[in-house]
Every structure is written in structure tokens, then in C-alpha cells.
């Protein structure tokens, strides 16, 4: 299996302080990055942690309390200013959709990348993202607002057989089945 890294950029603080930042984590797997929540100060923490901006494939927002999403519009704006062209998917509670539309229309309407919002059902567990190497599914959470956690599962890979390590002592025949 490939390395599966989690960068904790912020946790445990509703307000940014000198020692703590609001919620944001980046899961890194197979040269791709996925952000969970984007609290205020996330960009600064990404730079401190040497987490690159150009590999973020998707952003998953758990709920729309400010400490989990106030850094989002700044992040999206920075992606545009840095010349991003790759589409970006944002997953979050349906209540985030209208807020995101207003912010994007006001601040980010002339960037060269597409932003796709995917409303997640915070009341049931479901796969919301899937590619060749992993799936991401929601986990309903109890909170004052609609809220979901995100479970990242790496898909199993087939073992790689190195022909140079296989020693066959007798001649073999090849059979074709039609």
C-alpha cells in the first residue's frame, strides 16, 4: 500500500490563536490531496506544513460553523490567483450550496477552474467520492447543524509479481481458453 498521510492543519479551536487553528486536515494518498474542513488560517498552516496547493483534488466540509469553513473562500480565491486550471469538487451539507454560490459569484467569478458543489445527505452513510485508489463516505454526526464526518478508505491493490523472482524448474505450456 502507498503511504497514507494526514496533515493536521488545525483542530480544537473555534478561534485562531497563536497556538491553535480552527479545523482543517489534509489527507494525502498517491500524489493526491483531499482537504477536510477549511477553517480560518488554513492557507498559512499549509505553507508552514509544506502541504502544496496544487494537488488538492476535493474539499469536504463537515458542517457550516465558521470554524470549519471561514477559510474556504480565501482558499478558492488563492487557487485562482495561483493559476489553477484543474476542476475542484466541494462536498458539504446542502446548506453550504447557496452560501458558496453567493461567495463565488462575488469573489471568484473569473477564475480558470471549475468548482463543482456536491450536496451530501448528512442523515445517512453513503459513498460520495470514488476513484481508482480510494472511496470517501459520509458518516452522519449529531451536532446543532446538519453534520457529516468523512471516512477515507484505500482500495486494495493487486500484488505486483516480479517475473525475475519466479523460478520455474520445468517447461511450461501455455493454454488458451476460448
State where each predicted segment sits.
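Alpha/beta-hydrolase-fold enzymes
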Residues: 158-164
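Conserved beta-strand hairpin/beta-sheet module of binuclear metal-dependent hydrolase folds
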Residues: 1-49, 87, 150-152, 159
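Metallo-beta-lactamase
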Residues: 93-147, 155-158
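Generic preference for hydrophobic
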Residues: 6-8, 90, 117, 136-138, ...
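Alpha-helix N-cap/helix-start and coil->helix boundary motif
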Residues: 43, 53, 66, 96-97, ...
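Active-site metal-binding motif and surrounding structural segment of the metallo-beta-lactamase
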Residues: 40-91, 119-121
Amino acid at each position: 500500500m502507498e503511504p497514507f498521510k494526514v496533515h493536521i492543519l488545525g483542530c480544537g479551536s473555534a478561534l485562531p490563536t497563536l497556538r491553535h487553528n480552527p479545523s482543517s486536515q489534509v489527507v494525502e494518498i498517491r500524489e493526491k490531496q483531499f482537504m477536510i474542513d477549511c477553517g480560518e488560517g488554513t492557507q498559512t498552516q499549509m505553507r508552514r506544513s509544506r502541504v502544496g496547493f496544487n494537488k488538492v483534488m476535493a474539499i469536504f466540509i463537515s458542517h457550516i460553523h465558521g470554524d470549519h469553513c471561514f477559510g474556504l473562500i480565501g482558499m478558492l480565491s488563492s487557487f485562482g490567483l495561483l493559476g489553477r486550471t484543474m476542476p475542484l469538487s466541494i462536498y458539504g451539507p446542502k446548506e453550504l450550496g447557496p452560501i458558496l454560490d453567493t461567495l463565488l459569484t462575488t469573489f471568484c467569478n473569473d477564475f480558470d477552474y471549475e468548482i463543482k458543489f456536491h450536496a451530501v445527505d448528512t442523515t445517512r452513510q453513503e459513498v460520495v467520492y470514488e476513484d481508482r485508489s480510494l472511496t470517501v463516505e459520509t458518516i452522519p454526526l449529531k451536532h446543532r447543524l446538519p453534520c457529516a464526518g468523512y471516512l477515507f478508505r484505500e482500495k486494495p491493490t493487486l500484488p505486483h509479481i516480479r517475473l525475475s523472482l519466479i523460478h520455474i524448474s520445468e517447461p511450461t505450456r501455455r493454454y488458451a481458453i476460448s
